Amino acid sequence: MSGTASLVHTLPASGDSNHRGLHSLKNSRRAADNEPLLRFREAKKVLGDVYGELKDNVAELEGVYKDIKENDFVSSEQREEIEAIGDSIKTIMDTFQRDNMKVVFFGRTSNGKSTTINAMLHEKVLPQGMGHTTCCFLQVEGSEGEVGHLQLDDNPQKIDMKMLGKIGHALSDENSDLPAMGQDSLLKVFHPKKSESGECRLLQNDVVILDSPGVDLSPEFDSWIDKHCLDADVFVLVSNAESTLTQAEKNFFLRVAKKLSKPNVFILNNRWDASAAETENIEDVKKQHLTRFRQFLVDELEVCSEREVNDRIFFVSSREVLESRLKARGLVQKAYQAEGHGTRALEFQNFERHFEHCISRSAIHTKFEAHNRRAHEMIGKMRLNLNSVLTSAAEQRSKLQNNLNESTRTFNECRVNFTQFEKAYREQTEQLRAEVHLKVSADFFEEIARLDAIIDRFEQPFDGSSSGMTKYKEDLAIFVDKCLSSDLEARCTGGLMSRIWNLENDMFQYVTKILAEPYQNKLEEVWRYRAPFKFSICVDVPALVNDFHEDLEFRFTFGLHAIIRRIIAYRSGQPVTAINTNLLTPLSLKQQSEKNSVRDAEASAASEEQAMMTQMVLTSAAFLANGSLGVLVVGGIVYKAVGWRVIAVGGAAYAGLYAWERMRWNSGAKEQHLKEQFRSHLAARMQQVSTAHTHHCETQAIREMDQVFDGLKATVGGVHREMKNDLDVQKTQIDAVDSTIRTLGTIKGKAVFLLRNLEQFASSYLRSDSPPTP
């Protein structure tokens, strides 16, 4: 071994308490820097003492919480949190003592993994040599007993060490009656930390060494990694200097790199003693190996940098080192040594030195950094829990001691004032309903009067075809609907918004005044996120003009057909545009029935019956009016009554009016006539739905006020319940609070002291330069 690593077998003495052990760190650190393996045991001892004190503090706090009555200022969640912390500490302490430094050796079959392990242990612990092949995982760890033994992973029964060569040897003919060992099974080898041949420094310092089958025996590496490698601190790849790095070896470590974050990997190029026979190309071969190893560690695995990689690759002969160490101890007479063995021995010692520093630093960080962080978290949770309980206790005591009478008076006044507020609210809502009714009704009829101006703003090319006319009416209805809805919303919202807002604000201000100051924030939270009120108005013009039938054929104002349509519209109580324009044609009944096919059967039948009666009357009148006999009869009667001059003048005036209207009938007149018919029809329909519209707006305003009132009432109800509960608690718990506050303050001081110990532990063991790199 390296001369720079002096053997230290015992831990420095420490006191019973954790802080006394921490004070001794300054004296022991200088020795620990020279013996990195010792730092792991020191850190384990110090952190274990911290956890012991933390366990006592949590147990004391649990006892205090149990003495406090249920539903007091310690909630059930806070009790459960402390109990969970206590359970976590027990679990961590159970596993804490089993934490150790673990190194796993991998490589192809017969590359010298077992020989390398024996060389590091200074003793032939594992079977090795020609013809021996490890068939399973062999885990070597220290035993406090004087005699070593074997133990299967799933069986606690001890097995004699003499059976190791048979059980772990894949090629042995004498293990037919022994337990079958699969390649991923584990055989534990418990070797005495102090044996007759001396003390094993690695095993003395809690280093666990894992030997593996050859990676070329099975491509199923995932089960190997999951079972045996996830807790490893260092991986050592034992390669053969007489061959290059194989894909099987690469694949294994690529799998490891995927499952572990940046594993620590060393590469031992074993059997470098073979280079003694080939001195000519030895440097070229070494450079070739170095290049491939660097590329694998830096570029492919990405586990170290270019600067670090030189301390991860070593060219050694494990056989030479083992036999040399056995000879030094007098266990063999002659040691195998080839030319250059001294350089290779120094290289092996250099590997051991870097390995010990690496595994110590890695194990402390991987095993203890998480424990240290977890202890910080648990102490932090305990302190937050304590602070919360102490704050609640102090507030409770202050309220119970000084504000009991004041709280009772405030509670009673709040209840009386809210009852008065509820009565006033009912009166205000009825007044608001009347105001909304007047305002909305007036605005609605004003919009009806403005229909001419709204319709005149509609500009779209007029198409007299059937499809064009349908599209024109649909677009006109949509345009008018948007204008009416937006105008009515603006009128109603603008006129009534200030009134509604002022009323809501008055409600909020009144309720704020009747609540005590500590509870006013609850009301502000409800009020802050409330959206402003706005009327939602939908006139739905397309639905109102659904029965609109335009009449764009030229019809003389004083013609018989026009007069009859006006009479029918008056008698039926409908706009004249709701009367079909083709009443005088027999085909109109069929067309009307097809248009209204979506209506129910009864309405369709009634419409057909009415249309048939109208058809009969109008057809009879038309035949009578158009027949020559009718003309002669009527003409004779009029002639006898008024004379021919009056008839001539009347006929001329009638003909003149007819000619004047006929001359003015063009596309523009048709469009204007259509808009006028549309306006007249829509105005009549809007007057019919004005009452429903007004009621709808009233409902919206009252609903808005009810929502505000319900929110205020729910908030005040919650405040009343809290005030009542506070009064009940204040009457019974003053003395208990005083005693609890004193006890909790003592526990809190202990928690602060433990935090300082953890910070000192992190500074001594977990900082980036601890232990220093060799």
From Swiss-Prot:
Catalyzed reactions per annotation: GTP + H2O = GDP + phosphate + H(+)
Disulfide bridges in this chain: none
Binding site for GTP: S110, N111, G112, K113, S114, T115, N270, R271, W272, D273, S317
GO cellular component: mitochondrial outer membrane
Broad class of the protein's primary localization: mitochondrion
Keyword Acyltransferase: no
GO molecular function: GTP binding; GTPase activity
Region annotated G2 motif, chain positions: 133-134
Chain ranges passing through the membrane: 618-638, 641-661
Coiled-coil region list: 51-71, 385-415
Membrane topology category: Multi-pass membrane protein
Enzyme's top EC category: hydrolase
Membrane side Mitochondrial intermembrane: residue ranges: 639-640
GO biological process terms on file: mitochondrial fusion; mitochondrion localization
Disruption phenotype: RNAi-mediated knockdown results in fragmented mitochondria, most likely due to lack of fusion activity. RNAi-mediated knockdown in a moma-1 mutant background results in mitochondrial fragmentation. In a drp-1 mutant background, partially restores some tubular mitochondria. Upon acute heat stress, in a drp-1 mutant background, autophagosomes clustered at mitochondria are detected in the epidermis.
Keyword list, A-Z: Coiled coil, GTP-binding, Hydrolase, Membrane, Mitochondrion, Mitochondrion outer membrane, Nucleotide-binding, Transmembrane, Transmembrane helix
Dynamin-type G domain span: 97-352
Region (G3 motif): 211-214
Ranges where the record places region G1 motif: 107-114
Segments for region (G4 motif): 270-273
Localization, UniProt: Mitochondrion outer membrane
Family under the similarity heading: Belongs to the TRAFAC class dynamin-like GTPase superfamily. Dynamin/Fzo/YdjA family. Mitofusin subfamily.
SUBUNIT field: Interacts with ced-9; interaction may be suppressed by interaction of ced-9 with egl-1.
Function: Probable transmembrane GTPase. Mediates mitochondrial fusion. Fusion of mitochondria occurs in many cell types and constitutes an important step in mitochondria morphology, which is balanced between fusion and fission. Dispensable for normal apoptotic processes during embryonic development.
Protein name: Transmembrane GTPase fzo-1
Originating species: Caenorhabditis elegans
Gene that encodes it: fzo-1
